[in-house]
Amino acid sequence: MRRAFTQNFVQGKEIGAAVAAWVDGELVVNLWAGTADEDGTKPWQVDTLSTVLSGTKGLTSTCVHQLVERGDLDLNAPVARYWPEFAQAGKADITLGMVMCHRSGVIGPRQRMDWTHVTDWDLVCERLAAAEPWWEPGTAQGYHMTTFGFILGEVFRRVTGNTVGQYLRTEIAEPLGAEIHIGLARTEQHRCADRVAKPHIRQMLADVDAPGYPTSLAEHPKAGLAVSMGFAPDDEVGSNDLDLWRELEFPGTNGQVSALGLATFYNALAQEKLLSRKHMDLIRVSQGGLETDLVLGRRVADHGWGLGYMLNQRCVNGPNPSIFGHGGLGGSFGFVDLENRIGYAYVMNHFDATKANADPRSVVMSNEIYAVLGVK
């Protein structure tokens, strides 16, 4: 593992990064190197926090599934049972499960929302409640890049009275001693790594000759991607006010974690401390998405989807197709392997927007764990 981790730096693929892994309840890997800033003046530390973007969805999904196991939520129930206003515009039958496996059709609002709108949680939820789905719910797959966190977060708030970030902190992170955050106090943000080569939305949509917010997914091949980014500022993933973006809660996209913290979280799943094995066997059943996704196209072909998590159906991240976790745009990834009792996480600050759960930097290390264990 140390050799594979070092090679990423030698080959010029990293600026700062960390990787951690637990096996059978024992911390066996905890490596970090490089710098947390592009200028090379801020050494990466064991508690350096990195933005994991959609890796946040693995944290949020686990919070939601804890409520399901307690009987407070039902995955087969309509979202509108918990959030009545959501039933508008043909959404009365959309279930929580549809949202968690990206099949609800609510990938974004029907109008563009700039950064000033996004910081108003109630306004975002009002727009989503009024929005018509972009396809008939349940009939197709399309990645809920930002709406995943808002829809589940609003349901969570209405049922518990707390936000996902508050619950994560008090019920999971603090008991585990894990550095995992959704919404980070400004007093803690000095520990955050700068994002380098961060993905710009304009670059991702640069080949689209169709200005303006789409009115239909048929307008151009990347219409779904444009809609799913409908909450993001015009220039980059994140915001023009990074301190505010880190401080607010976006339960689908702005988690701040250390590699050790995220691996500790997934180790707790491996140890069945957060969810029962019976429930985890349910949520890692494939819900489709291996071939076509109306937002990501064929980019999901490496994994497939469970209920809130990425799977490993093509065995890219090791030989076990039944692991589950979540990657984030840029390269971070974390997962749990129940059969081999592994909790793994890799984070970095040099973003590669071309990979999600299959970034070569992480893939080589996740496979190395299995090689060391002799698992084929």
Q: What role is predicted for each listed range?
A:
Residues 1-52, 74:
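Short, conserved catalytic-motif segment at the N-terminal edge
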Residues 198-259, 285-339, 376:
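Active-site Gly/Thr loop motif
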Residues 31, 114-136, 162-179, 228, ...:
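Short, charged, amphipathic alpha-helices and their helix-cap/turn boundaries
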Residues 45-47, 131-138, 148-150, 241-251:
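Flexible glycine/proline-enriched surface loops and loop-helix/loop-strand junctions
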Residues 102, 148-155, 249, 253-275, ...:
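Active-site-proximal alpha-helical segments within enzyme catalytic domains
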Residues 2-6, 25, 49-76, 152-157, ...:
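Active-site SXXK
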Residues 46, 51-55, 67-111, 129-130, ...:
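Active-site helix/loop module of the DD-peptidase/beta-lactamase fold
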Residues 271, 275, 284-295, 354-376:
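Short, gly/Ser/Thr-rich active-site loops of penicillin-recognizing serine hydrolases
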